[in-house]
């Protein structure tokens, strides 16, 4: 568990020689759909005061902390659309124990929502006041800055005022009456493990620069080069194999329930999947399809 749950792309984890993803895929999985909402909403009981609060991820800031226990707090800390959303969340989110994080989907009254890049279509018109896609649960002893995160692996019940969207997924087993929990691994896993014996891995600082280079290549639409990997050709090759492995695993995943997803009017399986077990939490996303769409979306922002 980590203080703030940042879900990594598998290929990014390998840059420093981290083997947790390779360990993870050899065991049983807890699988869910990755929901493309915005902004991120954090809510629950503030351990410092015992009062209910709402906020964005800024509630975890070390210095300029923005925890909102009243509407006046929201007016002081936020403005514009984010403030409006937080006012709705303060009014309609249930007062339950614990601390949660999820993505805001929208307000009730429709059966179709485009909170960020992907459009979600529900079976019926949503009658609840707000819609949230929860994904993370936090525990904290006395201060939100000390909160410890873990993936949300239990169900939050809808209320008459708030609809919670958590779309489960499974691994295709080949049997119509059996939901798989383990991946079928291809020979590329052995290729990766063999290549790792000869690769010179990079530091955390160097890995951060490589990730920036990768994001730039996606945003600007050019192919990755050796220079993007700081001249480390074998690491670039390993990175490519990890993408092949990720795509193979993603192809084995299936949506179990939840709203239909559309991108630019075309039906898609969703943004991707989130897999979790004792070795960590990872996202299986086609970055060339969805990250570039997010980069080019004027609504896209980290709040």
Where are each of the predicted segments found?
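Active-site-proximal "nucleotidyltransferase
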Residues: 1-39, 47, 51-112, 212-259, ...
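Short, surface-exposed beta-edge/turn micro-motifs
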Residues: 28, 38-40, 129, 269-273
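Covalent nucleotidyltransferase
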Residues: 35, 40, 51-204
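Short, ordered beta-strand-loop transition motifs
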Residues: 47-48, 125-126, 266-269
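A two-mode feature
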Residues: 135-303
């Amino acid at each position: 568990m980590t203080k703030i749950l940042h879900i990594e792309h598998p290929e990014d984890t390998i840059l420093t020689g981290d083997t947790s993803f390779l360990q993870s895929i050899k065991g049983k999985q807890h699988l869910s759909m990755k929901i493309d909402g915005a902004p991120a909403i954090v809510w629950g009981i503030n351990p410092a005061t015992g009062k209910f609060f709402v906020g964005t991820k800024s509630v975890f800031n070390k210095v300029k902390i923005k925890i909102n226990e009243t509407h006046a707090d929201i007016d002081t800390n936020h403005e514009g659309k984010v403030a409006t959303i937080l006012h709705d969340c303060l009014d309609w989110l249930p007062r339950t124990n614990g601390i949660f994080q999820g993505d805001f989907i929208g307000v009730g009254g429709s059966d179709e929502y485009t909170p960020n890049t992907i459009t979600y279509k529900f079976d019926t018109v949503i009658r609840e006041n707000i819609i949230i896609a929860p994904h993370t649960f936090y525990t904290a002893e006395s201060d939100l800055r000390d909160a410890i995160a873990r993936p949300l692996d239990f169900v939050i019940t809808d209320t008459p005022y708030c609809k919670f969207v958590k779309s489960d997924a499974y691994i295709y087993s080949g049997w119509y009456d059996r939901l798989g929990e383990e991946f079928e691994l291809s020979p590329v896993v052995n290729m990766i493990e063999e290549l790792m014996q000869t690769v010179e891995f990079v530091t955390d600082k160097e890995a951060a620069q490589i990730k920036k280079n990768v994001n730039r290549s996606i945003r600007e639409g050019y192919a990755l080069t050796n220079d993007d990997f700081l001249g480390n050709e074998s690491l670039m090759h390993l990175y490519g194999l990890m993408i092949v492995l990720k795509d193979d695993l993603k192809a084995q995943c299936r949506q179990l329930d939840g709203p239909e997803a559309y991108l630019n009017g075309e039906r898609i399986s969703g943004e991707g999947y989130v897999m979790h077990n004792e070795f960590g939490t990872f996202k299986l996303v086609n970055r060339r399809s969805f990250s570039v769409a997010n980069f080019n979306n004027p609504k896209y922002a980290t709040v």
